[in-house]
Amino acid sequence: MSRVGVLVLGPAGAGKSTFCNGIISYMQSVGRRAHIVNLDPAAEASEYEFTVDIRDLISLDDVMEELSLGPNGSLVYCFEYLLENLDWLDEEIGDYNDEYLIFDCPGQIELYTHIPVLPTIVRHLQNQLNFNLCASYLLEAPFVIDTSKFFSGALSAMSAMILLELPHINVLSKVDLIKDEYSKKRLKRFLNPDPMLLVDSANADTNSKFHQLNKAIANLVDDFGMVQFLPLEAKNPDSVSTILSYIDDITQWGEAQEPKEPNDALEIEDM
């Protein structure tokens, strides 16, 4: 039987840990068993205890102190050390055969764009531990509601999709922080975006010498046709349930269950 897990990705401050806590809280309320696997050696205290914690193997603070490395160099060192000690990870998660594992990942994009750290861990989980995985990439709504920043976020989400080679959902987090400030129509433009329409807005806010670049980026996003977002309010059980239903549909959680369709996407009006 395949084991099921979801990798929670996204830049620092996107709300990854809050999302993980929201999933755990919702699952507990409906009687599902789940655990958080912390893969961030610089993680802070969480609402829910980590079942598996990379800091039990190696921590960012220890590396910075002992090797006199900066934060990014220390993070890379921590993950290279983890790759050399994957037997530790195997042992830590080896007993969770029929429970849902949520992998809370650090926000540094270079861990899968510049060095093959996360892709290597993904392959190990799939091939050695028989995990059926899904990736969820979070971008915070207050950031990407700016059109030019939206394209930046969309490119980072596409990068994760391509390099990790996992079934993937994109999540627009912290929608509750802006839904009173922006119209529903404007918010929906960023959930299922038409890049060629958004580029006109980007051009209005940037120097004319960047217009060709904006168009090229919009064409790239449009050609892939893979960047759509689900709205998330991490404290709203209905919102978390909707996101989780998409993850369940991708991973087909529970072989004994019939394959099921995801819930209807939660409309902005319902949040």
From Swiss-Prot:
SUPFAM superfamilies: P-loop containing nucleoside triphosphate hydrolases (SSF52540). One of its GO terms (biological process) is mitotic sister chromatid cohesion. Pfam families: ATP_bind_1. InterPro entries: Gpn, Gpn3, P-loop_NTPase. One of its GO terms (molecular function) is GTPase activity. A motif (Gly-Pro-Asn (GPN)-loop) lies at residues 70-72. The record marks N72 as: Stabilizes the phosphate intermediate. Keywords: GTP-binding, Hydrolase, Nucleotide-binding. GTP binds at G13, A14, G15, K16, S17, T18, S173, K174, V175, D176. PANTHER family: GPN-LOOP GTPASE 3, XPA-BINDING PROTEIN 1-RELATED. This is GPN-loop GTPase 3.
